[in-house]
From Swiss-Prot:
Catalytic reactions on record: 1-aminocyclopropane-1-carboxylate + H2O = 2-oxobutanoate + NH4(+)
Classification via Gene3D superfamilies: 3.40.50.1100
Cofactor(s) the record lists: pyridoxal 5'-phosphate
Stored InterPro entries: ACCD_DCysDesulf (IPR027278), ACP_carboxylate_deaminase (IPR005965), ACP_carboxylate_deaminase_bac (IPR020601), TrpB-like_PALP (IPR001926), TrpB-like_PALP_sf (IPR036052)
EC id: 3.5.99.7
GO molecular function, one term: pyridoxal phosphate binding
Annotated protein name in UniProt: 1-aminocyclopropane-1-carboxylate deaminase
UniProt-listed PANTHER family: 1-AMINOCYCLOPROPANE-1-CARBOXYLATE DEAMINASE-RELATED
Enzyme class of the recorded protein, top EC level: hydrolase
Function: Catalyzes a cyclopropane ring-opening reaction, the irreversible conversion of 1-aminocyclopropane-1-carboxylate (ACC) to ammonia and alpha-ketobutyrate. Allows growth on ACC as a nitrogen source.
Modified residues (N6-(pyridoxal phosphate)lysine): K51
Species annotation: Variovorax paradoxus
């Protein structure tokens, strides 16, 4: 496998810490040892997150190609768009963000706080759009790029989650290589890794990265899109492409992609009772905050799998905390009593 052949523009601090979740593990019976890899602490650029790791492999193309405007898309509380805005500010580039109405959640402050507030503060041109949720290429995003060109600019396209970009999975291959290095220092290997999946490239890159040592199917994706078949197909397609790019040496098949479909409901961006319980448990036992859109759902999935005995006793499980906490502010009504 050859990741080093791709240029990387460093936007992160370095290897993210792996934190033992001792109190949460004990609360859930103590038969499984839970850990978290804190991607939510990976950068000083507006709180960072998994998209910042991905952007390290996209930004060289933007800089080398003389692009002057980063153009991205997401929901109103998109972590992706916040991280793109931060990178643009850091590099002195312009930024246009399309924020679609992906979540059926009504709150007077939903489009004024959290991620979207930070993007505005960082100087991004934020454009609200009424279109609903989908993980594919969007007409509103293409129109934003056309608008930049019409104004004499040179737009660099960054799709939702970086996922439709050919190099969108490379950062998560690097995540897997980083975990392997940390495992050597810890003196043990993780039996499973739990990660949230929506647009697919995070899990896809991890599948490829861990396929290098035979653990592709130990990457357990927790669907948060509530459109799991579409997400599964996108993970598989991106993983196949990424495996070819990094010269993995074998094809990625459906058996390599594990996506748990039980925890994404009722809709994208809307938490269920299990999501809310998981957010509170993580916060109250570990002081680790998660959000209702992504990490709360993957945390719910991990907790429930422990409760159901789906991880064998003695397993060491690594939870990939991808970020997303700024969105909590947009859901403040749900937590008005804690």
């Amino acid at each position: 496998m050859n990741l080093k052949k791709f240029p990387r523009h460093v936007l992160t601090f370095g290897p993210t810490p792996i934190q033992p979740l001792k109190r949460l593990s004990a609360h859930l019976g103590g038969k499984v040892d839970l850990y978290a890899k804190r991607e939510d602490c990976n950068s000083g650029l507006a709180f960072g997150g998994n998209k910042t790791r991905k952007l390290e492999y996209l930004i060289p193309e933007a800089l080398e190609g003389g692009y002057d405007t980063l153009v991205s898309i997401g929901g109103i509380q998109s972590n992706q768009t916040r991280q793109v805005a931060a990178v643009a500010a850091h590099l002195g580039l312009k930024c246009v963000l399309v924020q679609e109405n992906w979540v059926n959640y009504s709150d007077a402050v939903y489009d004024r706080v959290g991620n979207i507030e930070m993007s505005r503060i960082m100087g991004a041109d934020v454009r609200l759009d009424a279109a609903g949720f989908d993980i594919g290429i969007r007409q509103s995003w293409e129109q934003a790029m056309a608008d930049v060109r019409a104004a004499g600019g040179k737009p660099f396209p960054i799709p939702a989650g970086c996922s439709e970009h050919p190099r969108g999975g490379l950062g998560s291959v690097g995540f897997a290589e980083e975990v392997r290095q940390q495992e050597a220092e810890l003196g043990f290997k993780f039996d499973y890794l739990v990660v949230c999946s929506v647009t697919g490239s995070t899990q896809a890159g991890m599948v490829v990265g861990f396929a290098a040592d035979g653990r592709a199917d130990r990457v357990i994706g927790i669907d948060a899109s509530a459109k799991p078949q579409q997400t599964f197909e996108q993970i598989l397609r991106i993983a196949k492409n990424t495996a070819e790019l990094v010269e993995l040496g074998r094809d990625i098949t459906e058996k390599d992609v594990v996506l748990d479909r039980r925890f994404g409901g009722p809709e994208y961006g809307l938490p269920n009772e299990g999501t809310l319980e998981a957010i509170r448990l993580s916060a109250r036992f570990e002081g680790m905050l998660t959000d209702p859109v992504y990490e709360g759902k993957s945390m719910h999935g991990m907790i429930e799998k422990v409760r159901l005995g789906e991880f064998p006793a003695g397993s060491k499980v690594l939870y990939a905390h991808l970020g997303g906490v700024p969105a909590l502010n947009a859901y403040s009504f749900l937590f008005r009593n804690g």
